[in-house]
Amino acid sequence: MSSVVVVGTQWGDEGKGKITDFLSENAEVIARYQGGNNAGHTIVFNGEKYKLHLIPSGIFYKDKICVIGNGMVVDPKALVAELSYLHERGISTDNLRISNRAHVILPYHLKLDELEEERKGANKIGTTKKGIGPAYMDKAARIGIRIVDLLDRDVFAEKLERNLREKNTLLEKVYGVEGFRLEDIFEEYYEYGQHIAKYVCDTSVVLNNALDEGRRVLFEGAQGVMLDIDQGTYPFVTSSNPVAGGVTIGAGVGPTKIKHVVGVAKAYTTRVGDGPFPTELHDEIGDRIREVGREYGTTTGRPRRVGWFDSVVVRHARRVSGITDLSLNSIDVLTGIETLKICVAYRYRGQVLEEFPASLKVLAECEPIYEELPGWTEDITGVKSLDELPANARHYVERISQLTGIPLSIFSVGPDRSQTNVVRSVYA
């Protein structure tokens, strides 16, 4: 049995898609376990760029099974569109498996997400407005509609009708907007269900069988630890658990089945949406990193907020996710910056904090304590090993590993898979 979980150690957008794609080459099964189409990842395959939001990045390899796990919330309309997008470009999706227990995002979830964000005004969370939160709310309230329900015409009709009564009351009485009619949703979404029916099964069985047979299984997290609903910067978080522990619930495999956890980080920090960000840059260096690193959201197109690397954040991620291996991305983006900074702790009212605080009020008063390191000017985009890095670049990478307490296993010096280098195998 060899299982690897890939998690983001920051606020998402760390380059997990690329690392998952890279690790997929040696995996036999690739599974997603949480989130929905609020996450976007860009994969370069055979020289072409593909943007995926729902389907695991291993889909490009016909001999590998790709799983959408039970912990995900699935927008059937978006999924059918993504399947068509791949088919039009000649990519087969016969290797896809969708959990019959995954929950379904429906039009009223999208509408409620949008309206609630508007209602909050200055206190908005900064959601992607993809209906993720409202769908997870229905799941917790035990009124959600699952994929297995979507495939059964009678069950879907009954549950949808019941939910619409409640949602329409909410839309009309609280938000003052028109509700939805059953006939405007039912046939369209039932057809989406029929379109994906051939992929639907009990994916927990698929995954556990693969693990029991000793096959290599890769679990692909979306977002990042700092967006985890329990461990992140609550309430500026997603509605699921991107931490490695989310695999056991969202994929239906026991905790004893997880062997390695790869924490993916950028050599700096980014964040999309609202919420605290202690090392955020509001100067020319921040603008430079954003432009060189092309820091714009895959899903939203929004410019990402940019800051220095924060070892307090990544240490927190290591602890709550049990991270065993570090994958450090986008080192090349920092080339040419004279002096680099790494946050080693926070200063709060004269105290030094080495652990990430739960209180946003405390966090708002925290000032980062920086360690300064000399930068480098050499082009590192063709580097294939740590030994080939300029001395200052290597020192920067090794210092991050020391400060976070995570051994370096992978480092990346560009967006292409050929620019991803292995220091030690995560499948060992």
From Swiss-Prot:
Substrate binds at T298, T299, T300, G301, R302, P303, R304. It is an enzyme of class 6 (ligase). Coiled coil: none annotated. It comes from the Bacteria. The active site is at D13 (proton acceptor), H41 (proton donor). GO terms for biological process: 'de novo' AMP biosynthetic process; IMP metabolic process. IMP binds at D13, E14, G15, K16, N38, A39, G40, H41, T128, R142, Q223, T238, R302. Binds 1 Mg(2+) ion per subunit. InterPro entries: Adenylosuccin_syn_GTP-bd, Adenylosuccin_syn_Lys_AS, Adenylosuccinate_synth_dom1, Adenylosuccinate_synth_dom2, Adenylosuccinate_synth_dom3, Adenylosuccinate_synthetase, P-loop_NTPase. Its cofactor is Mg(2+). It catalyses: IMP + L-aspartate + GTP = N(6)-(1,2-dicarboxyethyl)-AMP + GDP + phosphate + 2 H(+). GO terms for molecular function: adenylosuccinate synthase activity; GTP binding; magnesium ion binding. SMART domains: Adenylsucc_synt. Transmembrane segments: none annotated. Homodimer. Plays an important role in the de novo pathway of purine nucleotide biosynthesis. Catalyzes the first committed step in the biosynthesis of AMP from IMP. This is Adenylosuccinate synthetase. It comes from Geobacillus kaustophilus (strain HTA426).
